[in-house]
Amino acid sequence: MSMRDVLISRLIVERYFEKLRNSLELDVAIVGAGPSGLTAAYELAKNGFRVAVFEERNTPGGGIWGGGMMFNEIVLEKELENFLKEVEIEYEVKEDHIVVDSVHFASGLLYRATKAGAIVFNNVSVEDVAVQNGRVCGVVVNWGPTVRLGLHVDPITVKASFVVDGTGHPANVVSLLAKRGLVEMKTEFPMDADEAEKFVVDNTGEIFPGLLVSGMAVCAVHGGPRMGPIFGGMILSGQKVARIVSERLR
């Protein structure tokens, strides 16, 4: 084996552990690297907050990539045009709506969030939250494959002033509190894009002290309808949760 093989390994290990060590105490831990989570990460990081996103899958981006039924295009409301210009995502305006290539959109959000300073930990699952004095104060993390395989391996804890559940339809983080009777959780209702886009933004916010909910998780928690491959509500929800947290941290 050449010394270069060892060098490659050492550089990866050193850089990753530096990144992890610097993320053990955060302003905001975002769970789920979908559209609302990445938008919130971008907005918070560009304003100087220490933000990390924990994504249990290998591929961040949530439900963006597949567009509608694997037709890799998505739709947004016209009001998102300024945001797309800000993050330099290309789009077309058709019939008073915005159409975007879903692969371009997902990769653009990922680039902007990480460029702004957010750290994305893919293949890392949040298996629990830390609660002290009646308030969520961090996340309990383990390797995604470890959790999926049910291996008996203890996790580690990351401290965070606020935690955002951006895990989409399952609302995984809120579910952890609901099964212990700490919060009430409803269920997602059938498709209604018009109502859902408004519902998800209106109901974005704190569900338990220190824990906020954004994106499709809002519909699962509060009993809102789903909306399919229109993503304006996801972006607006991510922006709203970032504003709420920013105001609380200042």
UniProtKB/Swiss-Prot annotation:
Residue numbers binding glycine: 226
Write out the coiled-coil annotation as residue ranges: none
Instruction: Write out the GO MF terms.
Output: iron ion binding; pentosyltransferase activity
Pfam families listed in its UniProt record:
Thi4
What catalytic reaction does the record list? hydrogen sulfide + glycine + NAD(+) = ADP-5-ethyl-4-methylthiazole-2-carboxylate + nicotinamide + 3 H2O + H(+)
Its source organism is: Thermotoga maritima (strain ATCC 43589 / DSM 3109 / JCM 10099 / NBRC 100826 / MSB8)
Gene Ontology BP, a term: thiazole biosynthetic process
Pathway assignment: Cofactor biosynthesis; thiamine diphosphate biosynthesis
Cofactor names from the entry are:
Fe(2+)
- Residues bound to Fe cation are 154, 169
Under the heading NCBIfam families, the entry gives: sulfide-dependent adenosine diphosphate thiazole synthase
Q: Quaternary form?
A: Homooctamer; tetramer of dimers.
Q: Which amino acids does the record list as binding NAD(+)? A: 36, 55-56, 63, 126, 152-154, 216
Q: What class of enzyme is it?
A: transferase
Q: Could you tell me the EC number(s) of this protein?
A: 2.4.2.59
Question: What name has this protein been given in UniProt?
Answer: Thiamine thiazole synthase
* Gene3D superfamilies assigned: FAD/NAD(P)-binding domain (3.50.50.60)
- Please explain the role this protein plays, according to its UniProt record: Involved in the biosynthesis of the thiazole moiety of thiamine. Catalyzes the conversion of NAD and glycine to adenosine diphosphate 5-(2-hydroxyethyl)-4-methylthiazole-2-carboxylate (ADT), an adenylated thiazole intermediate, using free sulfide as a source of sulfur.
Give the record's family classification: Belongs to the THI4 family.
Record's keyword terms, sorted: Iron, Metal-binding, NAD, Thiamine biosynthesis, Transferase
